Amino acid sequence: MTRRILVVDDMPYLRDIQVLLLNDAGYATTAVGSAREALERLSDLAPDLILLDVSMPGMDGCQFLARLRAAPEWQRLPVILTTGRSVEDVARENRCDVLPKPFSEAALLDLVERLIGSASSGGS
């Protein structure tokens, strides 16, 4: 079964790059432009992992993550926060994996594979 990833980023060109890299690696990827849209579509999409921008207008990535972790069915869902801020600060505040921007294709795919396995694996 192909692993599903939800990309949440308000910058269209960054979303497109992330989707391209993940799709090329064999993952089934859906992208949305806001945390609110991600919350609305989460149950239907049932992702195996979320790649989440920290800095977005409206509800930011950290607020989204807090809501996600408050829901029992999503507490264990792997999340990678992407940020231009201090990685240590973001990781400490949110207790999850953080990928600093700009990031390389190798860094993205290595972290995704570490968390959920290869695109067609049953997990890590």
Enumerate the predicted regions with their spans.
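Active-site residues of response regulator receiver
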Residues: 53, 83
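Short amphipathic alpha-helix used as the core "switch/output" element in two-component signaling
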Residues: 40, 62-75
